[in-house]
Design a protein with these regions (language model features):
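N-terminally biased helix-coil "hinge/interface" segments that flank
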Residues: 25, 29-30
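Short beta-alpha connecting loops at secondary-structure transitions
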Residues: 5-21, 43-45, 62-67
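Gly/Thr-rich phosphate-binding beta-strand-loop-beta motif of the actin/hexokinase/Hsp70
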Residues: 1-2
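A contiguous, well-structured pocket-lining segment that forms one wall/lid of small-molecule binding clefts
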Residues: 31-169
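Glycine-rich phosphate-binding loops at beta-strand->alpha-helix junctions
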Residues: 170-175
Length: 175
């Protein structure tokens, strides 16, 4: 008989508007930044122009007051947020469009991996800061998308290795 246990997950993020947040990745971008920075979140100018200050304020209030904001620790919502911050997709016309576009934009020749805390690899605040920093510096979205993907994979490899040793496991599964 096989037994499965959830050993790790990254930060839970509010999904402002519930399922609507999966169709409107900009909501997850606001959620991500609000969760990490609070009301003083660093919003890229281009993002504010595309989405609008009123929408951002409304969603921020929803998160602050915990109104219709179920939590998600799914990778898809994180990828939605990053795709929106990079200006790749603010709205999904079909399921997982933003993460797919983020992957398509990634320049596979870029081997950059952002540095991260190997003792706490699932704390992705450093990853978001690195993405925002590169965005502010004018690094092409294709390079940022590649570094984001590579870093996200690397952090999970570190976490899986840690859990395998800690739990004395010979097999681990990503779900």
């Amino acid at each position: 008989r096989t037994e499965y246990r959830r050993l790790s997950h990254h930060l839970y993020l509010p999904m402002p508007g519930g399922d609507i947040a999966a169709r409107e990745p900009w909501r997850m971008a606001v959620s991500l930044l609000y969760s990490l920075y609070g009301e003083n979140m660093p919003l890229p100018d281009d993002f504010v122009k595309r989405v609008g200050e009123d929408r951002i304020k409304l969603v921020s209030r929803m998160i602050a007051r915990r109104i219709n904001t179920p939590l998600s620790s799914g990778a898809g919502r994180l990828f939605d947020a990053v795709a929106s911050l990079l200006g790749i997709a603010d709205f999904n016309r079909y399921r997982s469009e933003a993460p797919q576009k983020l992957e398509q934009v990634a320049d596979r020749s870029i081997l950059k991996i952002y540095s991260f805390d190997k003792d706490n690899p699932l704390d992705f605040s450093w990853l978001v800061k690195a993405v925002l920093n590169d965005l502010q510096k004018g690094v092409p979205c294709s390079e940022i998308a590649s570094a984001f993907h590579r870093t996200y994979a690397a952090m999970w490899c570190v976490e899986l290795a840690k859990q395998a040793v800690r739990q004395k496991l010979s097999r681990v599964v990503l779900c």
